[in-house]
Regions:
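Conserved NAD(P)H cofactor-binding loop of Rossmann-fold oxidoreductase domains
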Residues: 86-91
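The beta1-alpha1 cofactor-binding region of Rossmann-like NAD(H)/NADP(H)-dependent oxidoreductases
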Residues: 56-67, 100
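Conserved hydrophobic beta-strands of the Rossmann-like cofactor-binding core
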Residues: 5-8, 80-84
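Substrate-binding pocket helix/loop in short-chain dehydrogenase/reductase
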Residues: 94-95, 102-105
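Aromatic pocket-lining residues of Rossmann-like dinucleotide-binding sites
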Residues: 23
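Conserved glycine-rich Rossmann-like NAD(P)H-binding loop of the short-chain dehydrogenase/reductase
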Residues: 26-42
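Conserved glycine-rich cofactor-binding loop
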Residues: 12-14
Length: 116
């Protein structure tokens, strides 16, 4: 039987990184999204063959489509056991003082990114 695989968005730091670590320690292969090659290399060195980095931004549909094509090809005839939509940002401070563009960016990443 092949190793169980999951996909987690936003694994560079924080909750995503902790989730990546948890699943690798429990015998899973994790496909994880990062936004740059530096993070991809750093995490690949740590998690080796248990981790496949996917470089994309959840707000960029073309990048997402490329990642999906790669995943389908890499998984061959198996499926992902789970998808963890973790990628997100938090803009600190009262909503009253946020710029509209910053609020829209937060919604685009946290809400629309999970939908895409």
């Amino acid at each position: 039987m092949s190793k169980k695989s999951i996909m987690i968005t936003g694994v560079s730091t924080g909750i995503g990184l902790g989730t990546l670590s948890y699943f690798v320690k429990n015998g899973f292969h994790v496909y994880g999204s990062v936004r740059n090659s530096k993070d991809a290399s750093r995490l690949k060195k740590i998690y080796k063959d248990n981790f496949t980095p996917l470089i994309f931004d959840v707000t960029k549909e073309a990048q997402l489509k490329k990642a999906v094509v790669f995943l389908k090809k890499d998984l061959k005839n198996s499926n992902l056991l789970a998808l963890v939509n973790n990628a997100g940002v938090a803009i600190s401070g009262p909503l009253l003082h946020q710029k509209v563009k910053d609020f829209e960016k937060q919604i685009d990443i946290n809400l629309n990114g999970a939908f895409r």
